[in-house]
Every structure is written in C-alpha cells, then in structure tokens.
Swiss-Prot record:
Protein name from the UniProt record: DNA-directed RNA polymerase subunit omega
Entry's Gene Ontology cellular component terms: DNA-directed RNA polymerase complex
Pfam families linked to this entry: RNA_pol_Rpb6
Domain of life: Bacteria
Annotated function: Promotes RNA polymerase assembly. Latches the N- and C-terminal regions of the beta' subunit thereby facilitating its interaction with the beta and alpha subunits.
UniProt KW Transferase keyword: yes
Subunit structure of this chain's protein: The RNAP catalytic core consists of 2 alpha, 1 beta, 1 beta' and 1 omega subunit. When a sigma factor is associated with the core the holoenzyme is formed, which can initiate transcription.
Keyword Transcription assigned: yes
EC number: 2.7.7.6
Gene Ontology BP terms: DNA-templated transcription
Length: 88
C-alpha cells in the first residue's frame, strides 16, 4: 500500500478543497483510461497516482482545464464535420 502525504500537493494546488477536486478529476481520467499516467503506476490506485502527479507539479487546475477545453474543441470539430456531411 502506498503512503501519500498531501502536504506537498496542497502547497502546489493552494488548498485542500481544490486539491480534492483536482485529484478526483485526474483519478477519474486515469480510471477510465482517458489519459495515461505521468508517473510510474507501481500498482497504485488512480487516486494515489493522481496525488503523486499533483505533488510533482505535473497536474494542476490549469492543465486539467486546458485538456478539457482541447477535448471539447476536437469534439465540436468532429460534430460540425458530421453535420456538414449529412447536409450535403
């Protein structure tokens, strides 16, 4: 079982509440295999991996928001292409 102290992660994010939200979002991505882990998995659960990534400064709110915006833009582009093909 991995032991993770959250103090370093809290310092990276700002407060415990935002840390929980960011770690939960990242853990969900890892659990659903939407994104690959940025640190070695070492047989850890997604929540532990997410906390380790935050602690190392690899993930934060800005990075998560940018990823989601990029995915939304790509999805919108695909949908617009599909609509244009249907209207032809």
């Amino acid at each position: 079982m991995a032991r993770v102290t959250v103090q370093d992660a809290v310092e990276k994010i700002g407060n415990r509440f935002d840390l929980i939200l960011t770690a939960a979002r990242r853990a969900r991505q890892l659990q659903l295999h939407v994104r690959e882990p940025l640190v070695p998995e070492d047989n850890d659960k997604p929540t532990v991996i997410a906390l380790r990534e935050i602690e190392k400064g690899l993930i934060d709110n800005n990075i998560m928001n940018a990823q989601e915006r990029q995915e939304a833009l790509e999805q919108e582009k695909v949908e617009l292409n599909a609509v244009s093909l249907l209207s032809e």
